[in-house]
Amino acid sequence: HLGRRVEISLILPSANLHEALNNHDKEYYQHRTEHFPLVIGLCGFGDNRKAWINNTTIESLCEKNHFAACFINGENKWYLNLGPIDNHYDFLEEDLLDYLYGNFKNLSPEAPLFVIGVSMGGYGALYHYLTNVEKYDGCVALSPATKPDFIDESKFGTLQSHFLKQKEKDLHVFLSIGEKDFIIGPSREFNTFLKENHVGVEYRFVPGADHSWTFWEKEII
């Protein structure tokens, strides 16, 4: 759906020290049958997939909690189908997941699937979750951009409209933003909308925090 080769970053939990010292199977990973929960991580505008690994302790979290994480580049396209060879929505929902489930035996559609994003990636995480509620087990959106000015709402809808479509369902969404964030105004308005429409989802507002990895790292721990 992107018409080109792309790079991803994938973290799979390894054997812990006890397992490694007591395991003599040279094909341990080939024989391992455990299915890990999978987290798809979406970066912000102007950033790339490596930001997650460079700015957070996500690798150690994967090891400690036994879950896998995959990070992709957003290429400033908001994780939407902006075509003709920039169909990032279909890439994530079809190409990426098919590749992961088809090539790594410890990843399976039967295991829990989550999507997490920061800033532009927060928008993407919400959009993908709300349009695929049956597929995802949860969504984390940190400092999400909730109303991009140049998104064609007649084509993609608004996040508000997608929340209203799904409000009767048991939504598992975590929203968080710092009170010093430059998009705090629209975020407060969005939170008011969520409360007034009884969506069952509300923001966590964090005093002193801004729009940065320093804040986002603390939120994912």
Residue ranges of model-derived segments:
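Non-catalytic cap/lid and distal C-terminal segments of serine-dependent acyl enzymes
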Residues: 1-221
